[in-house]
Each structure stands twice: as C-alpha cells, then as structure tokens.
Swiss-Prot record:
InterPro entries: SGNH_hydro (IPR013830), SGNH_hydro_sf (IPR036514). PANTHER family: PLATELET-ACTIVATING FACTOR ACETYLHYDROLASE, PLATELET-ACTIVATING FACTOR ACETYLHYDROLASE IB SUBUNIT ALPHA1. It is found in: Cytoplasm. This is Platelet-activating factor acetylhydrolase IB subunit alpha1. In the adult, expressed in brain, skeletal muscle, kidney, thymus, spleen, colon, testis, ovary and peripheral blood leukocytes. In the fetus, highest expression occurs in brain. Belongs to the 'GDSL' lipolytic enzyme family. Platelet-activating factor acetylhydrolase IB beta/gamma subunits subfamily. It holds the Pfam family Lipase_GDSL_2. The gene is PAFAH1B3. It catalyses: a 1-O-alkyl-2-acetyl-sn-glycero-3-phosphocholine + H2O = a 1-O-alkyl-sn-glycero-3-phosphocholine + acetate + H(+); 1-O-hexadecyl-2-acetyl-sn-glycero-3-phosphocholine + H2O = 1-O-hexadecyl-sn-glycero-3-phosphocholine + acetate + H(+); 1-O-hexadecyl-2-acetyl-sn-glycero-3-phosphate + H2O = 1-O-hexadecyl-sn-glycero-3-phosphate + acetate + H(+). It comes from Homo sapiens (Human). The keyword Kinase does not apply. Originally the subunits of the type I platelet-activating factor (PAF) acetylhydrolase was named alpha (PAFAH1B1), beta (PAFAH1B2) and gamma (PAFAH1B3). Now these subunits have been renamed beta (PAFAH1B1), alpha2 (PAFAH1B2) and alpha1 (PAFAH1B3) respectively.
C-alpha cells in the first residue's frame, strides 16, 4: 500500500477547525526548542506522550536523559509524519526516538494505521540514521470491550511483526495488564478510559525506561546484545 493510497501514511497537518492555530503553534515551538537542545531521547506522538511530561515520573526517569517531548493531543500517524517532515528532526541528533501514536486514527483500518507507523519509522531512519526507534504499542481503551480496543490489538500484532528483526527499530508492548479479568479498565489507571492517570503512567514509563537504558548501553558497548521483548 503506497502513501497515496493510505491516508494514515500521507503527511497531513491538522485542520484548524477551532480557528486558534494552537496545533501549528505547538509545532513551531517544538522546532524552535530543538535548535538549542542536545537530547539523547525524543518522544513524539499524541496526548499520551504530551501528558506524560506533566507527571513526576517524567522528571524522575526521562529528564536525566535530556528528553524532549513533542506530543500533541489528538494527533494521528499522518500528523506526526507531517511534523517530522517539517522541521522537528532538523536540528537535533538524538540517540533514540520514541514513537507513540495511532489510537487517534479514527476511520483508518488496522492495516492503514500500521502503514502509518511504518512510514514514521522509515522517515526517522532516513532523517536520523544514528538513532534507534522505539515504537510503543497502542493501549487498550474504553471501560468495556469495544471495536477500538480490538483494532488497537490488531495494530500491535501487525507492528510487532513488521519490526521483527529490524536493526534500528524496536516494538515495546507497554501494557502492564490494564484490562481486568472481567474485561473492564479501571478509572484509577485511565481516568477517562483512554488517558493514563499518574498511577497508570508508572508501569508504562518504567518498562520504557528500562528498554531505553539497555539500548543506550548497547550503543555505548556496555551491554549484552538486546533481546526483543517476548509477545
């Protein structure tokens, strides 16, 4: 499937339906912020990335890595692609780029969302060949079982398979088990059954931080060869 056929892999700016220009203002701020920073890690994605920055665990785990947070609420894969093609990677040379996006790709199939994520990985590989890419798996959503939850699960399976054996990209299923045995998700973990609470962010961020440290150590020749996380 080519980018022309797949709307999820066609770089597209957000339509400013509210008329206040906030999305473009954030994009310009990210480009400006990158000009005088030397991050080891860059996070890019939707509100799950954006809101992480407000949690204490960000300051505990990721600030020491001089991490930049380029998350914008509501973004889909096509919006992240546009941002990356328009300056957000130009002035930095991170060692790792963390990508967490796809749950907002409403109206796109699991295959299309996967194509969008693969396009992001390819673009980062082209623009930042020294960097590894870590793709975080999409989380379950909704208090009760629903089609979007199933679609996110399918995306994760497809992305995991697509990145298997990739020399510079890694898939991490960061879900610690948010779905309970009765099929429900607790508001203690996801306060609106989509966005993570501080409690919900903790296991996700600790699993990610562990992987980031392993990757950074491996690139510095201090670690054993990385084994991909088991399905």
């Amino acid at each position: 499937m080519s980018g022309e056929e797949n709307p999820a892999s066609k770089p597209t700016p957000v339509q400013d339906v509210q008329g206040d220009g906030r999305w473009m203002s954030l994009h310009h701020r990210f480009v400006a912020d990158s000009k005088d920073k030397e991050p080891e890690v860059v996070f890019i994605g939707d509100s799950l990335v954006q809101l992480m920055h407000q949690c204490e665990i960000w300051r505990e785990l990721f600030s020491p890595l001089h991490a930049l947070n380029f998350g914008i609420g509501g973004d889909g894969t096509q919006h992240v692609l546009w941002r990356l093609e328009n300056g957000e990677l130009e002035h930095i040379r991170p060692k790792i780029v963390v990508v967490w996006v796809g749950t907002n790709n409403h109206g796109h199939t699991a295959e299309q969302v996967t194509g969008g994520i693969k396009a992001i990985v390819q673009l980062v590989n082209e623009r930042q060949p020294q960097a590894r890419v870590v793709v975080l798996g999409l989380l379950p959503r909704g208090q009760h079982p629903n089609p979007l939850r199933e679609k996110n699960r399918q995306v994760n399976e497809l992305v995991r398979a697509a990145l298997a054996g990739h020399p510079r990209a890694h898939f991490l299923d960061a879900d610690p088990g948010f779905v309970h045995s009765d099929g429900t998700i607790s508001h203690h973990d996801m306060y609106d059954y989509l966005h993570l609470s501080r409690l919900g962010y903790t296991p996700v961020c600790r699993a990610l931080h562990s992987l980031l440290l392993r990757l950074l150590a491996q690139d510095q020749g201090q670690g054993a060869p990385l084994l991909e996380p088991a399905p």
